[in-house]
Amino acid sequence: PKTIVYFLMLFFTFHSCSKEDTNTDDNNPNTHTNTITTWAHTFQPSTLNCYIGDTIYFDLGGSHNAIEVSEDSYNNNDPTPIENGFEFGYGQSGIFIPVDPKTYYYVCVPHLPEMKAKIIVQ
């Protein structure tokens, strides 16, 4: 009888202390935080490689903005924003979390053609 009681005590102690796996897409330990800043008339880094779900923090200087554009607009130094793309105003900070594996192109409107960059998401 005492052996059974001890066994049950140990069983419930270990069972109550075990941790349930709560890893979901919203709580993914494999995601990373990346920061994009401005320096003179450039984004730093000019090309960022990351993964779906990573957090990308934009920290823009006062005379810079960042708007997402199409690849065509990017290549032609055209600041036309794409529909439903990300946009951060002059001197703003903000977060962008990519949900699609593709290349996101963005520019600083007043500093084209020098100030443009891309985010490559795998």
What is the meaning of each model-derived region?
Residues 1-7:
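Sec-dependent signal peptide recognition
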Residues 7-9, 59:
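Acidic/proline-rich low-complexity IDRs
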Residues 10-11, 101:
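Residue-level signal for mature regions of secreted extracellular proteins and peptides
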Residues 13-16:
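C-terminal motif of bacterial Sec signal peptides marking the signal peptidase cleavage site
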Residues 18-122:
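Extracytoplasmic copper-binding redox domains, predominantly the cupredoxin/blue-copper superfamily
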